[in-house]
Amino acid sequence: MPSFDVVCEANMVEVKNAVEQANKEISTRFDFKGSDARVEQKEGELTAFADDDFKLGQVKDVLLNKMAKRNVDVRFLDYGKVEKISGDKVKQVITIKKGVTGDLGKKIVRMIKDSKIKVQGSIQGDAVRVSGTKRDDLQSVIAMLRKDVSEAPLDFNNFRD
């Protein structure tokens, strides 16, 4: 019985490359001369540091541009609150979303059931497993999900026959 998984996870290699490129551009830009602006990456989160709110916005702008160039969907990013650190400096923690959330998983399963396509959807941890009897049905489910789900970047993997 053919099946596949619907997942929501960023390519962490591309995220790392985007962070490195952003830091390189920030270090060479004239408007950041003498400032301590940078982006750091730790496991599932990024931290943007800058001298003030305006420069923090500039740092995030550079990061988003580099991520877009590396084909990393910016919907993976979840921005935290801007925190003040020593003196005037500020930082912001940006979390990278991983996995299909419970609400989104339920919505995907409901959409699959409402579509009347002869497939079954089940939530398995942070992924949704879709299985059916025909490959064509699975392909039509993929097309439907790509068209209708816009709040999260979905990937389809683990195809089995």
From Swiss-Prot:
SUPFAM superfamilies the record matches: YajQ-like
GO MF assignments: nucleotide binding
One Pfam family recorded for the sequence: DUF520
Keywords assigned: Nucleotide-binding
Transmembrane segments: none
Coiled-coil boundaries: none
One Gene Ontology term, aspect cellular component: cytosol
UniProt function note: Nucleotide-binding protein.
Family: Belongs to the YajQ family.
Family matches, as NCBIfam families: PRK05412.1 (NF003819)
Name of this protein: Nucleotide-binding protein Reut_A2760
Lineage, highest ranks first: Bacteria, Pseudomonadati, Pseudomonadota, Betaproteobacteria, Burkholderiales
